[in-house]
Amino acid sequence: MADLKAFAEQLVNLTVKEVNELATILKEEYGIEPAAAAVAVAAGPAAGAAAAEEKSSFDVVLKSAGAAKLQVVKAVKEACGLGLKEAKDMVDGAPSVVKEGLAKDEAESLKKTLEEAGAEVELK
């Protein structure tokens, strides 16, 4: 186990030139494509952990309507395709989940729309 940790430490500390040399050796002698090897070595364990933890779906949570409650109700109504009463109930019941399972760009867009209307919004 100690040998593997030492090996991992050496991989993480490689320079760009050394990574390129390693990629060449892996391709020529072992048939491993250099792009996959270079990415794996250059990323290191910290970057790999961060990529694994990055979420692919987000929930948009309305924390509060703020001072412009009417504008927020209208924005929620439009964004969710709800009736006026349902949108008002959602805003009145804050904190509440406006939409679940959105892609990051969709969630950011909805968050921006609601914040422009005056709401306090959080992505989870």
Swiss-Prot record:
SUPFAM superfamilies assigned: ClpS-like, Ribosomal protein L7/12, oligomerisation (N-terminal) domain
GO process annotations (BP): translation
GO MF term (any one): mRNA binding
Any one of the GO CC terms: cytosolic large ribosomal subunit
Pfam families: Ribosomal_L12 (PF00542), Ribosomal_L12_N (PF16320)
Keywords in alphabetical order: Ribonucleoprotein, Ribosomal protein
InterPro entries: Ribosomal_bL12, Ribosomal_bL12_C, Ribosomal_bL12_C/ClpS-like, Ribosomal_bL12_oligo, Ribosomal_bL12_oligo_N_sf
Protein family according to the UniProt entry: Belongs to the bacterial ribosomal protein bL12 family.
NCBIfam families in the cross-refs: L12
HAMAP family: Ribosomal_bL12
Role this protein plays: Forms part of the ribosomal stalk which helps the ribosome interact with GTP-bound translation factors. Is thus essential for accurate translation.
PANTHER family recorded: 39S RIBOSOMAL PROTEIN L12, LARGE RIBOSOMAL SUBUNIT PROTEIN BL12M
Subunit note: Homodimer. Part of the ribosomal stalk of the 50S ribosomal subunit. Forms a multimeric L10(L12)X complex, where L10 forms an elongated spine to which 2 to 4 L12 dimers bind in a sequential fashion. Binds GTP-bound translation factors.
Protein name: Large ribosomal subunit protein bL12
Organism: Bacteroides fragilis (strain ATCC 25285 / DSM 2151 / CCUG 4856 / JCM 11019 / LMG 10263 / NCTC 9343 / Onslow / VPI 2553 / EN-2)
